[in-house]
């Protein structure tokens, strides 16, 4: 695993240097923003009711940092599901810079603002915690609270996990990397272990910052994640 993510370590070192002037939000002052549809609204109440509702709840990797809205992960996922015959609306609830703490604070607001209960909530948080060196125990506690709230509301979960870069050290990486599989088992959630798998180490699939995927990288991720989402939406 370490050999596969050597380039990831370099990207993390770069971003850690930028973290102090990034879009990190102060407690109580985070930008929640509206939950937006990944594509054009569907016409007709009956047609809307027949479609599955997926909420992509996460950070910049879901929000679509550095790409056009129609190139974002939620937008491309919706298109890919349609190509498989799965009628679904994928709502983009990604906020760039979000840590697990910020995500937890806005979770209820996000869910309560929806027209109906989602058929699936995808969660991708923790990358910014790792970049800022936040204690993995805190990250685990926040993600546990997020999963517990989704379970309390009867909403199925799909976790798209993150992996600590090798330069974070073994003492950090081991507890951090175990979080997503542990929570998937505890909350009977679907799991894609590493959102950037096969992408973050390929410069052709990444933006110049080396941290966020470009449109081609997003397509590569969507290709891998779509079958898992489709399976999670099956009755």
Which residues does each PLM region occupy?
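N-terminal secretory targeting modules
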Residues: 1-57, 67-68, 82-86, 115-117, ...
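Conserved Rossmann-like nucleotide-binding pocket used by diverse enzymes
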Residues: 17, 91, 158
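Acidic/histidine-rich, surface-exposed loop or edge segments in extracytoplasmic proteins
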Residues: 55-63, 93, 125
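Glycine- and acidic-residue-enriched helix-capping/strand-helix junction motifs
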Residues: 64-72
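Acidic-and-aromatic substrate-binding clefts and catalytic sites of carbohydrate-active enzymes
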Residues: 68, 98-101
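Signal peptide-proximal N-terminal region
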Residues: 76-90
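Alpha-helical cap/lid subdomain in secreted, periplasmic
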Residues: 86, 104-235
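A short beta-strand-loop structural module common to alpha/beta enzyme folds
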Residues: 87-99
